Amino acid sequence: MGLDITCVDIDKKKIDGLNNGVIPIYEPGLEEVVRRNVEEGRLHFTTELTDCLDNVEVVFSAVGTPPDEDGSADLKYVLEVARTFGRNIKKYTVLVTKSTVPVGTAQKVKAVIREELARRKCKVPFDVASNPEFLKEGAAVKDFLSPDRVVVGVESERARKLLPKPYRPFLINNFRVPF
């Protein structure tokens, strides 16, 4: 798609493996996509979100939401990303949640980011958006490259204008992204 992407994970072993070309999951076509984009300098891996926040406008968060004891989604990883984001942003950035989360999660994410900014005594503008995945296991690469739909939920006009950028290749082919 021509974008520079930095993938962040707290698992150092996983990141070391990815930096050495070891893909921790099997998904048809994924190894080739990763290899090609690493070779072309567009794909990077790190354990530190802070390594990439200075030069980005959009951060996509795709973390696990395992079921909690009562069967609801456990949002601890989603909220930990929000905490790290709030502790480290320096300029306007949009945090986009890709994970499957319940209605109202964006408000919780915003509250966590605001708390972290208040602790820092900072007034950095930000937005939170939702962009759920519609990828089938075994067909994720194909589904990503040829989506039947892309849905993005935003609250601000600023985020609405910014978020089509990552989807520009789809928009060029008359693919509609509803906001």
What positions do the PLM features span?
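Structural/interface elements that position substrates and couple domains in central-metabolism enzymes
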Residues: M1-F179
